[in-house]
Amino acid sequence: MDKDQIKKELADKSNEILTKYGEPDVVEEVSVMNMSSKTVFLGSLKVFNYEIVPNLIKDLNKQLKGYGELVVRDQRVTPCCSPSYIHISFNVTINN
């Protein structure tokens, strides 16, 4: 398993999906947690248009599920001094 290649592909696919829906956020890097029996790739996206969230999550599931066990979560964030947004996070778990 080439972890650097998977990290790059996950970030690229996430950015393609954000671009498809006209979102300004960019996924610069996907984090990696190495464990003895598995490797977990962690990424997050910031989405300002609430209406596209269900379709964006569907696209994420479709694009990323082939890498391993995929979990996608979303949470509304309301900062004090900037526009509110939906934080979408994903983990892809690959058994070693």
Functional labels for PLM-detected ranges:
Residues 1-47:
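An N-terminal amphipathic alpha-helical segment
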Residues 7, 18, 27, 53, ...:
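Residues marking helix boundaries in flexible regions
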Residues 13-23, 59-64, 80-81, 86-88:
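Hydrophobic alpha-helical membrane-spanning segments
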Residues 40-82:
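Short, hydrophobic/π-rich interface segment
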Residues 74-96:
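C-terminal edge-of-domain segments
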